[in-house]
């Protein structure tokens, strides 16, 4: 069942605008997925997802400021855009004029995430996913990516759904990663250590 967006509509800049061009949506609200609307994220974190035949949610990606999202960019049905934080989005009338690079970047991020979920070993999937999230949303530190958990609320359930593993397996592996020093918490940040081959790595390019 599709949930209604918990959103606040701001007035359009011009009476000729056919639909609200800007939305403020609360955490756990849903970004509208109208057939012809593409949104550009101004702030916040959005998760795109669909549902399997047995009703299980399938995460498709995480999207942040500068990314383009919306029904025209997906061929899946159902297709949902859930706000993991408070989100501000603006409607893009012509994505080709707005930014061709944003579309290319979105496709590349999705491709990488899908390749991670196809890994067979749960440990490899989780390690690759944490690295992907670090490159995508973290800041490079002295020894690893620093992910601000106030801005990127990574619960065990969210991580499990993104990696395609169960929550029990994800929780167990996260504990093993902590014991091995591969991840650790500092204040409200999660530190994901760089792989030795990427120490220190260059930031992910679009």
Swiss-Prot record:
Q: What induces it?
A: By sulfur deprivation.
Q: Which SUPFAM superfamilies does the entry mention? A: cAMP-binding domain-like (SSF51206), Winged helix' DNA-binding domain (SSF46785)
- Which parts of the sequence belong to the HTH crp-type domain? 120-196
Q: What GO terms fall under cellular component here?
A: cytoplasm
In which compartments does the protein localize? Cytoplasm
Question: Transcription regulation among the record's keywords?
Answer: yes
Where's DNA bound on this chain?
Answer: 156-175
Which cysteine pairs are joined by S-S bonds? none
Annotated GO molecular function terms are: DNA binding; DNA-binding transcription factor activity
Keywords per UniProt: Cytoplasm, DNA-binding, Stress response, Sulfate transport, Transcription, Transcription regulation, Transport
InterPro entries documented for this protein: cNMP-bd_dom_sf (IPR018490), HTH_CRP (IPR012318), Tscrpt_reg_HTH_Crp-type_CS (IPR018335), WH-like_DNA-bd_sf (IPR036388), WH_DNA-bd_sf (IPR036390)
- What does the record give as the function of this protein? Probably regulates the expression of genes from the sulfate permease complex.
> What is this protein identified as?
Regulatory protein CysR
Q: What is the lineage of its organism?
A: Bacteria, Bacillati, Cyanobacteriota, Cyanophyceae, Synechococcales
């Amino acid at each position: 069942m599709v949930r209604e967006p918990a959103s606040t509509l701001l007035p359009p800049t011009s009476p000729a605008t056919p639909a609200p061009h800007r939305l403020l949506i609360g955490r756990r609200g849903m970004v509208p997925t109208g057939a012809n609307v593409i949104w550009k994220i101004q702030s916040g974190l959005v998760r795109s997802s669909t549902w399997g035949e047995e009703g299980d949610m399938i995460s498709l990606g995480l999207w942040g400021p500068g990314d383009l999202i919306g029904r025209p960019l997906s061929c899946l049905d159902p297709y949902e855009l859930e706000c993991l934080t408070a989100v501000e989005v603006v409607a893009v009338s012509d994505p080709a004029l707005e930014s061709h690079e944003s579309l290319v970047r979105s496709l590349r991020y999705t491709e990488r995430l899908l390749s991670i979920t196809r890994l067979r070993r749960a440990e490899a999937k989780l390690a690759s996913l944490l690295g992907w999230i670090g490159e995508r949303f973290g800041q490079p530190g002295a020894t690893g990516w620093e992910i601000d958990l106030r801005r990127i609320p990574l619960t065990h359930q969210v991580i499990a759904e993104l990696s395609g593993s169960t929550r029990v397996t994800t929780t167990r592996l996260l504990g093993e990663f902590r014991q091995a020093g591969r991840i650790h918490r500092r204040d409200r940040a999660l530190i994901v250590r760089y792989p030795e081959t990427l120490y220190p790595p260059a930031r992910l390019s679009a």
